[in-house]
């Protein structure tokens, strides 16, 4: 019987030190040496770790591995965006690299599919299978960094920002999300600033409450409607945690956070003649008066079979100007990678649906059908 090897990408620094001490009988500083090799040098070969003694290298080869998701397909957009299908087990999740003049952002998935069934999101139409492991979340960053590193001659910018805005709801995978975030921030990991790592949530209040005092990163919230009636129609999670409950915990999180500089990013997808009217803009502006924020408007990105359309430029412009009358900071997200279906709301991957779509989801606490790892 073959014993499965331990994937070292599943450990943050604390977990790796504990594993080295308790399972390998090694001093904790050895764990930090190995961690530096993994994340600073993109190394997955123990034999290349030349400051590690041979005895430990042999022990690591016998018991451990460094295994990130691999790229099963890559698509390149005309604007420089790259979408990778990353193989996790027998399925794919999607990871998107978005280069800009002064930064390069990586959009990372947290689940295989999504159980929340937001009506405007193509990921939701794929159903839900399971949570990603720590190694499968941080492994997307590791693999992407390595892919970019292999293409230095093209002048691609190294990853400077990570956004948890890919497939899935991050706060329904807290067990694996937090260690992955810790590795992103750790000096021995990717060493990113807390202001350059963003978690986006559709409103999992219990998860956001757990984050308070536990991890400090930038926060973006998927609001997408100015009132509970409309939000429940397009985002069923609102039936479990309504807007008032959501914004209350958001205010508490940003009050405890240094990463957010006192403001949360409010994401609002504009759906033609659904939530993009002037009356919706006035209602949204009033709703957010007590929540320090900047508002990011996202014109809808169509996908095959979608019942919604992108609003006209005049409707988008009018919505923005109405919000600005209330002295809100309002931006319109530039669509990137839409020619390869890599834009916001277009990610689908390859998902074996484990949810029963003929039955309504019951948002009782976090009693959503989530297979944990």
From Swiss-Prot:
PROSITE patterns (alphabetical): RADICAL_SAM
GO biological process, one term: tRNA methylation
Positions contributing to [4Fe-4S] cluster binding: 114, 118, 121
Known catalytic reactions: adenosine(2503) in 23S rRNA + 2 reduced [2Fe-2S]-[ferredoxin] + 2 S-adenosyl-L-methionine = 2-methyladenosine(2503) in 23S rRNA + 5'-deoxyadenosine + L-methionine + 2 oxidized [2Fe-2S]-[ferredoxin] + S-adenosyl-L-homocysteine; adenosine(37) in tRNA + 2 reduced [2Fe-2S]-[ferredoxin] + 2 S-adenosyl-L-methionine = 2-methyladenosine(37) in tRNA + 5'-deoxyadenosine + L-methionine + 2 oxidized [2Fe-2S]-[ferredoxin] + S-adenosyl-L-homocysteine
Disulfides per UniProt: 107-344
One Gene Ontology MF term: 4 iron, 4 sulfur cluster binding
Pfam families named in the record: Radical_SAM, RlmN_N
Binding residues for S-adenosyl-L-methionine: 168-169, 200, 222-224, 301
CDD domains with a match to the protein in the record: Radical_SAM
Cofactor(s) recorded in Swiss-Prot or TrEMBL: [4Fe-4S] cluster
Keywords: 4Fe-4S, Cytoplasm, Disulfide bond, Iron, Iron-sulfur, Metal-binding, Methyltransferase, rRNA processing, S-adenosyl-L-methionine, Transferase, tRNA processing
Gene Ontology CC terms: cytoplasm
Compartment annotation: Cytoplasm
Active site feature: 94, 344
Record domain Radical SAM core: where: 100-339
Enzyme Commission number(s): 2.1.1.192
Gene3D superfamilies to which the protein is assigned, alphabetical: 1.10.150.530, Aldolase class I (3.20.20.70)
Catalytic EC class: transferase
Cofactor binding summary note: Binds 1 [4Fe-4S] cluster. The cluster is coordinated with 3 cysteines and an exchangeable S-adenosyl-L-methionine.
Function text: Specifically methylates position 2 of adenine 2503 in 23S rRNA and position 2 of adenine 37 in tRNAs. m2A2503 modification seems to play a crucial role in the proofreading step occurring at the peptidyl transferase center and thus would serve to optimize ribosomal fidelity.
NCBIfam families hit by this protein: PRK11194.1, rRNA_mod_RlmN
Additional note from the record: Reaction proceeds by a ping-pong mechanism involving intermediate methylation of a conserved cysteine residue.
Family (UniProt): Belongs to the radical SAM superfamily. RlmN family.
Name by which UniProt lists this protein: Dual-specificity RNA methyltransferase RlmN
